[in-house]
């Protein structure tokens, strides 16, 4: 017979306790929106979290893969919350590469020294939308 864990915690509550999201409502929204995968599959917020489960989280441009190491439903300080999971080495490496690529991409984009004045702004609009005169 299967032994029940001491604490059963919903996925949305665990993500909130592990400090991936500020509110449970936001965690629930991300799960329902397909941004969180539990063991490689889409899940529901009410899914019970198990030890050593693999979670894939998409947050903005970042995607991280974590393994559940501990289960709690209480939100603790960030230093303690980091002990609830372990990010995989591939995930860390991939996030660092993506951050570097974003940083390098930002360097190639032109940033003007000042805002365009009235004449320059009109010239930009004419260029973007074509000369309507």
From Swiss-Prot:
Induction annotation: By heat shock.
Swiss-Prot/TrEMBL keywords: DNA-binding, RNA-binding, Stress response
NCBIfam families associated with the record: PRK10348.1
InterPro entries given in the database record: HSP15 (IPR025708), S4_RNA-bd (IPR002942), S4_RNA-bd_sf (IPR036986)
Residue span, S4 RNA-binding domain: 9-71
Organism expressing this protein natively: Escherichia coli (strain K12)
Assembly notes: Monomer.
Gene: hslR
The protein's role, per its UniProt record: Involved in the recycling of free 50S ribosomal subunits that still carry a nascent chain. Binds RNA more specifically than DNA. Binds with very high affinity to the free 50S ribosomal subunit. Does not bind it when it is part of the 70S ribosome.
Protein name per its UniProtKB record: Heat shock protein 15
Region (Disordered): 105-133
Similarity comment: family membership: Belongs to the HSP15 family.
């Amino acid at each position: 017979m299967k032994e029940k864990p001491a604490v059963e915690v919903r996925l949305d509550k665990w993500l909130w306790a592990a400090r991936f999201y500020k509110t449970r409502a936001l965690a629930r929204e991300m799960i329902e929106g397909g941004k969180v995968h539990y063991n490689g599959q889409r899940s529901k917020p009410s899914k019970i979290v198990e030890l050593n489960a693999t979670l894939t989280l998409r947050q903005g441009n970042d995607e991280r893969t974590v393994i559940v190491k501990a289960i709690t439903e209480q939100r603790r300080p960030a230093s303690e919350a980091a002990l609830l999971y372990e990010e995989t080495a591939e995930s860390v490496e991939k996030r660092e590469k993506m951050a570097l690529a974003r940083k390098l991409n930002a360097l190639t984009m032109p940033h003007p020294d000042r805002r365009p004045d009235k004449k320059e702004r009109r010239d930009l609009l004419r260029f973007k939308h074509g000369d309507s005169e």
